[in-house]
Amino acid sequence: MLKNRFRNITRLALLLIVIGAIGNVVLYMLGKSPFNLGELSTEQSVRMDQTTNLLIHTETGTVDVVPIKGHEIKAVLEGKTTKQSLEDYRLNITQDQGQTRIEVIQDSKFRFFDIYTNLKLTIGIPETQLNQLQVMTDTGNIYVDSVLASEYRMISDTGAIKMDIKEGVIKAETNTGAITASLDHILQDIYAISDTGDIIIQTAEAPQALRTKLSADSGTIKVTLPNYQDGYIGEGGPLVELISDTGDLEIEQYSGK
């Protein structure tokens, strides 16, 4: 009797699974399934002449910061997400006393099917010097290309950070991603930390003076700059501090772009 009841429950469960699967297939074909994807594309612009500090924040997706022509900062959010979530993402830009904040707002915080979301935020900045450029993302990579700033602050929980800049103070932090910073020359302090990723600092011009503080628990440390010895080049100079628990650390001269 008990065995028959268990068999009936098992059959009912299998039947419900089959019905659910068929229902999802039908909904997908009708374009109403949670698995159906849609294209997201939205953009906003803001005047550059009112900006000295720029803060960019998004919880999901990659961030590219690139130089552009013109007099406005241009923010473009594009990618794919489930059709049910298309209205959940929007750009929000605010300005206050010289600081411009660009943020991707996610109205619905909890979804079962967020693994299908693939977004990219591209910020175009005119060729004007910023005091500070700050980029923060929870799950995506960060790339900064030739944008002028006195200070760069990059934070990503799980993504990689890559920078191609002329010079400036650098503060870069990520938990699991790699950090690569390529500069024309090292004239200001650099601080970079990654729990598990490699950290590479590249300079086209060898520094005449430099101080380093390098800490890698299980990774290798490699510095191939000319005249580098025991953590120093010459006397004084900017400080390059690199920290990684399991990643490799490297400072090198390269041929440039």
Residue ranges and their predicted role:
Residues Q84-L86, P207-Q208:
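A cross-taxa feature marking solvent-exposed loop/turn segments within ectodomains of secreted
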Residues V25-L40, Q44:
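Aromatic-capped interface at the extracytoplasmic side
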Residues M1-F6:
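N-terminal Lys/Arg-rich, disordered targeting/topogenic segments
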Residues T60-T62, G79-T81, S108, T139, ...:
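Beta-strand elements of well-folded, non-transmembrane domains
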Residues D164-I165, V169-K257:
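Short, surface-exposed interaction patches in beta-rich subdomains
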Residues L40-N53, T62-D64, G70, L86-G168, ...:
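Right-handed parallel beta-helix
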Residues G70-K80:
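Short Gly/aromatic-enriched secondary-structure transition segments
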Residues I9-L27:
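Hydrophobic membrane-insertion alpha-helices, especially the h-region
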